[in-house]
């Protein structure tokens, strides 16, 4: 809204310096600062409001030190509000790339909110069932997949994607495009949800990954850069960078209150929303196959859970008793039970995510 207002003032009155509103880098920076300020300013009051009623139930299967924590949940609402307001102010929200990402953020945010509300207020053990979460994820995947495959703005590019490390290699999804979209959205939203187990881990890791996607979006939206780097040119895709910067700094602002010792946790409201946002952003800029690199931490966390469950079932069937690969899954709890301090685990996992981000940048030239 502010973008359109300032653009109108610039066109009618032509004040000096206001033409900067047309620069993508300016609006991305403005959106980032706005999102950060909203989270920092609104955070204390928001925490007090949630603490009055929405306290996360303690999980008995959690490591001992986690059983003592009683924190307000649904903090993801603060992230969602910050991003939505910042994007409405600074992005061209008529751009379909923008509102598709905003739809993903809100859609899975609502699913996560229902889950958190069920656990905290309605006292439903386990919250929203996995089946209904899956319905929400599949529904979002269907909407995004069908819309992008039919709308002329997207349909030319969407069914094909590039392969990291290869210059001219593309994959045509064909009739499998919509199922691929559903799988990626479901996988990423669940992966970020699994990662959200230590103070600051999901927020910090998501900020790094979304920042990386924002960089790729900026390059993909510029025909010169896209051609030089042999990545798909996404007309109008540069607006995605504005959204990514807002989401990055909303996570950083949330981290101010979520860093150990946390005052609030994002809950499924935040983790499912951020995961779907990462997935849809990657799909729109045709970098979904880069996610195992850029978002490698999320995949490791998910893989640790899958391996633990499969190995336990196999050994129980083979030997009569279930055995474990890890002391506890997801992976961060394994290191916690090995005696690593929570802060050390989080910072080391951030470092791993930064290294994966740098590796993903290298793929631009290693083709």
UniProtKB/Swiss-Prot annotation:
It catalyses: UDP-N-acetyl-alpha-D-muramoyl-L-alanyl-gamma-D-glutamyl-meso-2,6-diaminopimeloyl-D-alanyl-D-alanine + di-trans,octa-cis-undecaprenyl phosphate = di-trans,octa-cis-undecaprenyl diphospho-N-acetyl-alpha-D-muramoyl-L-alanyl-D-glutamyl-meso-2,6-diaminopimeloyl-D-alanyl-D-alanine + UMP. Catalyzes the initial step of the lipid cycle reactions in the biosynthesis of the cell wall peptidoglycan: transfers peptidoglycan precursor phospho-MurNAc-pentapeptide from UDP-MurNAc-pentapeptide onto the lipid carrier undecaprenyl phosphate, yielding undecaprenyl-pyrophosphoryl-MurNAc-pentapeptide, known as lipid I. This is Phospho-N-acetylmuramoyl-pentapeptide-transferase. Disulfide bonds: none annotated. Belongs to the glycosyltransferase 4 family. MraY subfamily. One of its GO terms (molecular function) is phospho-N-acetylmuramoyl-pentapeptide-transferase activity. Pfam families: Glycos_transf_4 (PF00953). It is an enzyme of class 2 (transferase). It is found in: Cell inner membrane. The chain crosses the membrane at residues 30-50, 71-91, 94-114, 138-158, 169-189, 200-220, 237-257, 264-284, 289-309, 344-364. NCBIfam families: mraY.
């Amino acid at each position: 809204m502010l973008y359109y207002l300032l653009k109108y003032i610039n066109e009618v009155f032509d004040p000096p310096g206001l033409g900067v509103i047309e620069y993508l880098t300016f609006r991305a920076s403005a959106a980032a600062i706005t999102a950060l300020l909203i989270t920092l300013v609104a955070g204390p009051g928001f925490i007090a409001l949630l603490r009055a009623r929405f306290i996360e139930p303690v999980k008995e299967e959690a490591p001992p030190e986690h059983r003592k924590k009683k924190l307000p949940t649904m903090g993801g609402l603060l992230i969602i509000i910050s991003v939505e307001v910042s994007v409405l102010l600074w992005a061209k929200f008529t751009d379909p790339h923008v509102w598709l990402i905003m739809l993903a953020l809100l859609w899975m945010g609502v699913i996560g909110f229902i889950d958190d509300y069920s656990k905290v207020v309605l006292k439903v053990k386990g919250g929203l069932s996995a089946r209904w979460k899956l319905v929400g994820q599949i529904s979002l995947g269907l909407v995004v997949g069908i819309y992008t495959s039919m709308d002329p703005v997207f349909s030319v590019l969407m069914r094909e994607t590039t392969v990291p490390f290869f210059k001219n290699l593309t994959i045509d999804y064909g009739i499998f495009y919509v199922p691929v979209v559903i799988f990626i959205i479901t996988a990423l939203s669940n992966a970020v949800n699994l990662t959200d187990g230590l103070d600051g881990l999901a927020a910090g890791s998501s900020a790094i990954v979304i920042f990386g996607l924002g960089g790729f979006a900026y390059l993909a939206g510029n025909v010169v850069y896209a051609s030089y780097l042999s990545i798909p040119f996404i007309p109008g895709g540069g607006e995605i960078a504005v959204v990514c910067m807002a989401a990055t700094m909303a996570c950083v602002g949330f981290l101010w209150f979520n860093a150990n010792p946390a005052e609030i946790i994002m809950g499924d409201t935040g983790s499912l929303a951020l995961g779907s946002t990462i997935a849809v952003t990657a799909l729109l800029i045709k970098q979904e196959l880069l996610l195992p690199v850029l978002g490698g931490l999320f995949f490791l966390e998910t893989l640790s859970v899958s391996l633990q469950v499969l190995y336990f079932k196999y050994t129980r069937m083979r030997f009569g008793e279930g055995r474990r690969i890890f002391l506890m899954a997801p992976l961060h709890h394994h290191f916690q039970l090995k005696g690593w301090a929570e802060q050390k685990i989080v910072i080391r996992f951030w470092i791993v995510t930064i290294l994966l981000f740098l590796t993903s940048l290298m793929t631009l030239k290693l083709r």
